[in-house]
């Protein structure tokens, strides 16, 4: 399948067929930041993703990428297709080099959580009733209050948070 240039400015990556296996760390230990930079609602917040910033996450990434190589290049299922590694390239072998090459293409899997800490300390955003500290009549009712991501899709736990919030708001 080829994406037309007119769609989001996409261009064809190369002139050969291929597949893109991916590695997804579903229990990352790296933590990013979202900071409000002004009181103007039109100013975007400052977002620092901080992907692969811990030793654990770099280890998982390196081992995952090595496993993908092994599956793609050494299993009978794929060997018959004579696969060649396009990126990062077989010349990159050291764990840190593999992670560096992978980090150039690291991105979210669109399930951000944990951006609005619950608690009573100065770094928390909401209390145990999901009310935002210092602001009346505002609650956070989504995955951002989760302390860490679930191993599966975040949809069901987020629905549970919303159901609990509805009960709290209704005084049940």
Give the location of each predicted region.
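FAD-dependent oxidoreductase catalytic-site/capping-region signature
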Residues: 4-157, 165-172
